[in-house]
Design a protein with these regions (language model features):
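N-terminal active-site segment of His-dependent metallophosphoesterases
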Residues: 26-102, 232-233
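Conserved beta-sheet core of the metallophosphoesterase superfamily
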Residues: 121, 237-242, 246-316
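Active-site-proximal segments of metal-dependent phosphoesterases and phosphodiesterases across multiple
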Residues: 196, 205-268
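A short C-terminal boundary segment appended to hydrolase-like catalytic domains
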Residues: 46, 306-351
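N-terminal secretory signal peptides and thylakoid transit peptides that target proteins
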Residues: 1-17
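Active-site environment of divalent metal-dependent phosphoester hydrolases
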Residues: 61-63, 96-99, 123-132, 167, ...
Length: 351
């Protein structure tokens, strides 16, 4: 089956499954029919490389399966030395309904990393408004991950200059394996003035390799979110949410961010997002005006049994400074998924 056909089939299957199936109850179909699972952990990285761990869409763990969330971050702590895990990237939808009990579960899981592995977070649509409805920009994120705790950490670089005491839009720097990295974490559907600030950050750090994390950027058909071109044919575009209507469409999707931010600089090396259902996976590579190829990656496991089955993504940056190994591993299943969408080697453009 061709890749696009496979995705269409998966999308149709997920569309007809009841929610209880997605959360691991009453399943009658094989949830890993599209996978290639093998037992064990990824091979240990070679000396001189480093790893970033990616946690997408933990909303179901925060709501219903907190033990899985705890198992993920504990595995990262237990593995960070032998794998040289330099940081953890959370891609948003930290919670499902923006409720205190869910934030408490998320806080408990992420706090296991404190003092061991730095972590960087961006909010998703479910982290906003009462019930996670994303009707406005209100969120409990700052109640449980307050700026006062993060601004003194050595990796912290700064926050959106109009909201210096809030965590929705931040950047962080890492020096690892003789490389200078900058993680730029932006809110769901970033506001235009947030993008203005992000441009200033990218300009200020021209020698840093920038990784953008934001909740919605590319879609599961391997294209960027583009409201003007696709409209509602790409589900869950930030422009389609109540917050857009409430703010005179002051939101940016993936195409907006490419045109207004990434394409204006030659130091972005990678984008990462979650958010999208269907098969929850995607990859899109496009060139900047300077001819540099920038991989854009979608990863989301929330449709798997038990809210995600513990899957996380490991990005191993090779010492050649040109390639990155991608592994999907579940600490709770103690398995790898080595299908073509889950295990790959990507080329990264230097700066």
């Amino acid at each position: 089956m061709h890749l696009f056909d496979r995705r269409q089939a998966l999308a149709a299957a997920f569309a007809t499954w009841p929610l209880t199936n997605l959360l691991g109850q009453n399943q009658t179909k094989d949830p890993y029919a599209d996978g290639k699972l093998i037992d064990g952990e990824p091979p240990l990285p070679v000396s001189g490389s480093f790893t970033l761990a990616v946690l997408p869409d933990t909303q179901n763990y925060s709501e219903r399966f907190p033990a899985t969330f705890l198992a993920q971050t504990q595995w990262i702590v237990d593995s960070h030395e032998k794998r040289n895990i330099a940081g953890v990237l959370h891609l948003g939808d930290i919670t499902n309904n923006n409720r205190p009990v869910e934030w408490e579960n998320a806080q408990r899981a992420m706090r296991q990393l404190d003092g061991k592995v730095p972590y960087f977070m961006c909010p998703g649509n479910h982290d906003y408004s009462e019930g996670g409805g994303c009707k406005d920009r209100t969120t409990l994120l700052n109640n449980y991950f307050p700026m006062s705790e993060y601004r003194t950490r050595p990796q912290f670089g700064g926050a959106y200059d109009k909201e210096p005491d809030r965590m929705e839009n931040t950047f962080h720097t890492l020096q690892v394996a003789d490389r200078n990295l900058l993680v730029l974490a932006l809110e769901f559907g970033p506001r235009r003035d947030v993008v203005r600030w992000a441009n200033e950050v990218a300009t200020k750090y021209p020698k840093h390799e920038i990784i953008l994390i934001t909740h919605a950027f590319i879609y599961s058909d391997d294209t960027r979110y583009d409201w003007r071109k696709y409209g509602a044919n790409q589900k869950w575009n930030p422009h389609a949410y109540p917050v857009a209507k409430a703010t005179q469409d002051d939101v940016c999707d993936g195409e907006d961010l490419w045109n207004l931010l990434i394409s204006k600089h030659e130091n972005f090396i990678l984008t990462l997002n979650g958010h999208v259902l269907n098969d929850g996976l995607g990859k899109f590579i496009s060139k900047t005006p300077g001819g540099r190829s920038v991989p854009q990656i979608l990863v989301n496991f929330q449709m798997r049994p038990k809210g995600g089955d513990g899957w996380l993504r490991l990005l191993e940056f090779n010492k050649d400074r040109q390639t990155m190994e991608v592994y999907d591993y579940s600490p709770t299943r103690k398995q790898l998924n080595v299908s073509e969408q889950n295990r790959m080697t990507l080329t990264l453009a230097g700066i």
